């Protein structure tokens, strides 16, 4: 049941085919924390919002000045219809759960995410995603600047660099968010 004091949404960020491959050989096991969080949110009527990165054909959104994204346009991948930008089959949206397309690292960048959140009067975000030092960090910072209350699910975030993940979870994120495990978050819902 949704807490009446705060209206919460779970953000599932960048769990798309072209990115989840970085989780390694045991993909199904690596996705378990995300699946648990999604299931719990649905059971407690908490909106689940999926976020992906994808670009238009011809990449008009990508500046050659953008070091991180300009290489993507050279590969001819990551367009909105490309298989790499589709949400992975193990964590698919259901029914009317929105899939937000962003054009930069933050889930807010160029997307309609803030409009969706404000329309539903959501003031608390639960963040999960790949990567911790990418979409999770950028979205957390922007969400904090927009005055959202923030929770980060430490075991439903991943970064190829475990040191970056650890430093962010233990030293940086706690300044602006509550960092907890999926199981601890689920316990707070009951």
Task: Show where each model-derived region lies.
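Active-site-adjacent betaalpha module
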Residues: 1-9, 36-44, 70-190
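A short alpha/beta connector and helix-capping loop motif
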Residues: 6, 24-41, 45-54
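Acidic-leg catalytic submotif of subtilisin-like serine proteases
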Residues: 10-15
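Short acidic, Gly/Ser-rich segments with clustered Asp/Glu that frequently serve as metal-coordination loops
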Residues: 16-22
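Active-site loop signature of alpha/beta-hydrolase-fold enzymes
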Residues: 18, 56, 159
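Early exported N-terminus immediately downstream of N-terminal targeting peptides
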Residues: 47-48, 52-71
């Amino acid at each position: 049941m949704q807490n009446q004091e705060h209206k919460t949404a779970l953000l599932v960020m960048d769990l798309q085919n072209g990115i989840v491959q970085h989780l390694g050989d045991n993909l199904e096991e690596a996705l378990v924390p995300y699946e648990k969080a999604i299931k719990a949110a649905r059971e407690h009527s908490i909106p689940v919002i999926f976020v992906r990165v994808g670009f238009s054909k011809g990449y008009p959104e990508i500046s050659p000045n953008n070091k991180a994204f300009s290489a993507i346009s050279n590969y001819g991948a990551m367009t909105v219809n490309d298989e790499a930008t589709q949400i992975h089959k193990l964590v698919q949206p259901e029914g009317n759960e929105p899939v937000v397309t962003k054009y930069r690292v933050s889930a807010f960048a160029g997307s309609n995410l803030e409009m969706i959140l404000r329309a539903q009067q959501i003031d608390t975000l639960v963040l999960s995603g790949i990567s911790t030092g990418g979409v999770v960090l950028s979205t957390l910072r922007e969400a904090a600047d927009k005055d959202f209350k923030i929770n980060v699910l430490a075991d439903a975030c991943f970064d190829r660099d475990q040191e970056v993940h650890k430093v962010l979870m233990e030293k940086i994120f706690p300044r602006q968010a509550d960092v907890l495990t999926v199981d601890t978050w689920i316990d707070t819902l009951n």
